[in-house]
Amino acid sequence: MPPNLTGYYRFVSQKNMEDYLQALNISLAVRKIALLLKPDKEIEHQGNHMTVRTLSTFRNYTVQFDVGVEFEEDLRSVDGRKCQTIVTWEEEHLVCVQKGEVPNRGWRHWLEGEMLYLELTARDAVCEQVFRKVR
């Protein structure tokens, strides 16, 4: 049975964010702002339905989905694109594949104790973020 990811998580650290943003062709100005951010994550997980909110002082992003059901994801507020997205469980990892202009794009969430890990991929870039559960 997959873990329940419901909770509010505070940013702890990240690695390789600039390479990830470059792989998405994000402008230099926006990359510089993004590298200063320490986003929080809020996840609501009820059965197969999930809402994931990324909250920061610059921009917030919310995605809602049903696990295993493909949907069109509007990422215009993130990088100006739309893509076809599907999120599935691979054992205890929540795995997202985003099909569109950028190859090998997606993310993976998993828990280790009170820590939430997020691995973001685009092209050959991999960014790792770590969050701590606060409630």
Swiss-Prot record:
UniProt GO molecular function: fatty acid binding; retinal binding; retinoid binding; retinol binding
CDD domains reported in the protein's UniProt record: CRBP3
UniProt record, GO biological process: fatty acid transport
GO cellular component, one term: extracellular exosome
Places the protein is found: Cytoplasm
Record key words, sorted: Cytoplasm, Retinol-binding, Transport, Vitamin A
Expressing tissues: Higher expression in adult kidney and liver and to a lesser extent in adult and fetal spleen, adult lymph nodes and appendix, and fetal liver and kidney. Strongly decreased in hepatocellular carcinoma tissues (at protein level).
Record Pfam families: Lipocalin
Source taxon at top rank: Eukaryota
Alphabetical list of SUPFAM superfamilies matching this protein: Lipocalins
Family: Belongs to the calycin superfamily. Fatty-acid binding protein (FABP) family.
Function: Intracellular transport of retinol.
Protein name, entry field: Retinol-binding protein 5
